[in-house]
């Protein structure tokens, strides 16, 4: 999914925007199987515990971990990614148990984007203070990492403590990649030290200045990574891919959605790759064309220029 100086392409779910009718999600798992066969690098799911009409976005509706477990059984190669799990809302043991279970069932394909949360309604619903989310995020990430270590553990955290017990199952490859989303209330230096990768919004996508500003942000982060080690950067965009391949990149809904033809999209992906982006997660739920048609065009005309790296999962998935 990630390699230095290379960009891969993934797909954000849902493939059709939920607006009160669950029927729009019918057949989505079949299309995810198609995404897997077509060679996309990843499928991404959101973590939206409550639908807040003021946000107007319910994500893929389903619980992210339950749904990824279902999709693990419908796919063989594609990475299964959260974008992003709000780890400040839930206990680290429960999060880690769900994550490592999916990682084992999928043969090591889980990539975990993590976030502190940005919807104020969720925190009092969980009995938590919205203002504490940054601190809880940092504690939760540390706790989860400790849980995945080998052997009997001794953990003493503001979020809980125990001694002399082992956490199971362990991740397939010894750890699950934890990609910090945005700032999550942390400094850039903290993200450089503690994150396995960084997922950020892309800035403007219809002009050259957006990728230029993104490149500056990525360079500033990478300059702070201890030892200069490679860590991937990811970004995303919601697109309305039109039939005309020459249609110019045009922002819609205040820049939330990009209407574009294939050539404009490829130019954007090339600019992102030059900026240091290693993975682009595209959301197609606002496209006017059928999802299957958009996926076919992306697979036929875009993926050959941004191929997935084809790494075999570290182990065979469990036999369901």
Sequence positions of predicted segments:
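Active-site-adjacent structural elements that line small-molecule/cofactor binding pockets in enzymes
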Residues: 1-320
